[in-house]
Regions:
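Small-residue-biased structural context
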Residues: 1-215
Length: 215
């Protein structure tokens, strides 16, 4: 699937999905480690905090500016079943994030619970992303106007706020040069200048998943 499959620009949506899958893979690898304490690594990792925050921003903004609006536009139509499924899938993910955080703070049984919870998160979120790409994006594309879709992007960016200089390189971490260039061409000129001038370099200095020896 590419952004050219739609009349609306889905490039950032697909980039967010790819970033979520990438981070899920990294989290799963940490949870499966036996040379360090995965619980300690995740509990203090910048990467875990960023993943949770950006995922919640994305889903909350979708719920409020996309699915909620589409419910009104598609009232009494069969497509509302798909909207209900999207919202239910979102609702199932937040409790898994909370359960993982609880396990990370559980000194007695957290290590035993962690791998199963991470696997449940990967399964739930992975299935949601696949479902949204298979059916949800096409429904968005056929229902929302350019202005309504632009509002989703604007609200999303506002919620990221001052962290945009970290958020954008995080999104594009491990993206191909071609895909990165495509995303950057869709930004205002200063966005590319900042990304190439300082944002990416500062992000590359971060050790998102560094193990720690404290706590």
């Amino acid at each position: 699937m590419t952004s050219t499959d739609f009349k609306l620009d889905m490039s950032m949506m697909l980039t967010i999905h790819d970033a979520s899958r990438r981070e899920l893979g990294r989290i799963a690898k940490i949870a499966a480690r036996n040379d360090d304490d995965p619980k300690q690594i995740l509990r203090s990792a910048i990467g875990w905090q960023m993943f949770k925050k950006y995922l919640r921003i994305h889903h909350t903004t979708e719920d409020e500016t996309v699915w909620g609006l589409m419910e009104q536009k598609l009232a009494e139509k069969p497509d509302r079943d798909l909207l209900a499924a999207m919202e239910a899938e979102h609702a199932a993910i937040d409790p898994l994030l909370d359960a993982i955080d609880e396990a990370l703070g559980d000194r007695d049984y957290g290590s035993q619970r962690l791998a199963g919870l991470v696997d449940a998160l990967a399964t739930s979120l992975g299935a949601h992303l696949k479902h949204e790409e298979a059916e949800g994006l096409a429904l968005i594309d056929s229902t929302l106007s350019q202005e309504q879709w632009a509002n989703f992007a604007a609200v999303h960016l506002k919620r990221v706020g001052d962290e945009v200089g970290t958020y954008l390189p995080w999104l594009l971490d491990s993206a191909s040069a071609e895909w990165t260039d495509m995303v950057l061409t869709r930004l205002p000129p200063h966005g590319r200048v900042n990304y190439e001038g300082s944002w990416k370099a500062a992000y590359d200095e971060l050790d998102l998943w560094a193990p720690t020896t404290t706590g």
